[in-house]
């Protein structure tokens, strides 16, 4: 092994989303400092081309399906590319990555991008938690993307305090600002009028994101258009709900957009009604771009926005409708919240802090 041997970043998805975007930021930042990476994951997502454009070697691997052949292919990949460390992201990738690292005799790091176990019925939940506890025994370090997540994981005994490192997900503020469209262009891309009030959200269309709350809030407060950027299993249900509530004309579903934050300048307010998050990267991106944010009062949102915060609400459609209406009606309040968010993102959630922490972690594990 030498210092030019790569680190493998293993993903369970290459769709546009927080995990793949995080890995892209890490690869872009640490390659400039001399690190080499291989990214492996499903080959059908739009982020694949983003990685390749960044000069990252991408190997298609169906980590979103459980098969012994995938594990065998992963072990062969680690050996063929002389991978010196495996860093996995997400459930399926965490299973494959840690088992393959063990078989190939290289250290394993795993990042939890949220602890989403509640959706499983009782027996399946117990089985999943038991599996994570066993996998922790062959994991050198567990990275938690927020302090709230670390506390929850420790309470569930998914890892030990000695294994855990908290590395807050950060965004490349300068790159984000440079790639964002002007307000006029962003609105044109989304088919929005310059004069209308716009609330936006970018998320996977999954039940845990509770995008239905935002649709219901739009029905309760007729003064704004709602833009949802993303895709997922809840898409059809959200469209039906909008039609039932009479807000289909005010709903824009933009679909899956790589680097969706480029379009955030189209929004007057960014909203997140998620029931649970690891660390909400899209919220951090909105903050970095100086947007006011209205979000459900959950630990991850409190951690990134700061608490107390005027943008936090109790998570009901009525609470969202009321707060969104008040923020949209007050340009001074929007400007102040946006400025506070930008300052907080740049001081506490900039990618440079995250990259330094991960570089230190990799160096420590590899004895560099």
Q: Which ranges hold each PLM region?
A:
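A conserved mid-protein helix/loop that constitutes part of the nucleotide-sugar donor-binding site
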Residues: 17-28, 197, 201-220, 233-240
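Nucleotide-activated donor-binding/catalytic signature segment of Leloir-type glycosyltransferases, i.e.
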Residues: 239-255
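Short hydrophobic beta-strand element within catalytic cores of glycosyltransferases
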Residues: 40-41, 292-295
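Aromatic "clamp/platform" in nucleotide-sugar-dependent glycosyltransferases that forms part
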Residues: 256, 275
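A short, active-site helix/loop in glycosyltransferases that binds the activated sugar's phosphate group
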Residues: 138-165, 171-175
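Conserved acidic donor-binding segment of nucleotide-sugar-dependent glycosyltransferases
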Residues: 306-318, 326-332
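N-terminal strand-loop element at the rim of the active site
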Residues: 9-69, 149-153, 157, 233
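A short helix/loop element that forms part of the nucleotide-sugar donor recognition site in Leloir-type
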Residues: 177-192, 333, 342
């Amino acid at each position: 092994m030498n210092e030019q041997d790569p680190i493998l970043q293993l993903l369970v998805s290459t769709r546009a989303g927080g995990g793949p975007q995080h890995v892209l930021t890490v690869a872009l930042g640490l390659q400039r400092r001399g690190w080499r990476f291989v990214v492996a994951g499903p080959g059908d997502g739009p982020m694949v081309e983003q990685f390749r454009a960044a000069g990252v070697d991408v190997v298609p691997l169906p980590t979103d399906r459980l098969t012994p052949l995938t594990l065998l292919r992963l072990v062969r990949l680690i050996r063929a590319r002389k991978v010196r460390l495996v860093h996995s992201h997400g459930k399926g990738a965490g299973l494959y990555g840690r088992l393959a690292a063990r078989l190939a005799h290289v250290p394993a790091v795993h990042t939890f991008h949220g602890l989403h176990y509640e959706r499983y019925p009782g027996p399946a939940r117990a089985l999943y938690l038991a599996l994570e506890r066993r996998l922790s025994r062959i994991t050198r370090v567990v990275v938690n993307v927020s302090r709230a997540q670390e506390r929850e994981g420790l309470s569930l005994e998914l890892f030990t305090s000695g294994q855990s490192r908290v590395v807050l997900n950060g965004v490349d503020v300068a790159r984000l600002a440079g790639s964002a469209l002007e307000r006029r262009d962003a609105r044109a891309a989304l088919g929005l009028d310059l004069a209308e009030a716009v609330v936006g959200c970018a998320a996977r269309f999954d039940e845990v994101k509770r995008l239905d709350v935002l649709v219901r809030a739009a029905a309760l407060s007729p003064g704004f258009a709602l833009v949802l950027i993303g895709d997922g299993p809840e898409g059809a249900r959200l469209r039906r709900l909008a039609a039932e509530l009479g807000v289909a004309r005010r709903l824009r579903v933009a679909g899956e957009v790589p680097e969706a934050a480029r379009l955030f300048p189209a929004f007057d307010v960014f909203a997140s009604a998620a029931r649970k998050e690891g660390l909400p990267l899209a919220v951090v991106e909105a903050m970095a771009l100086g947007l006011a944010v209205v979000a459900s009062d959950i630990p991850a949102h409190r951690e990134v926005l700061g608490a107390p915060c005027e943008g936090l609400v109790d998570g009901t459609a009525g609470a969202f409708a009321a707060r969104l209406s008040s923020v949209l009606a007050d340009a001074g309040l929007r400007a102040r919240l946006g400025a506070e968010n930008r300052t907080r993102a740049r001081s506490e959630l900039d990618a440079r802090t995250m990259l330094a922490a991960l570089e230190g972690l990799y160096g420590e594990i590899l004895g560099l």
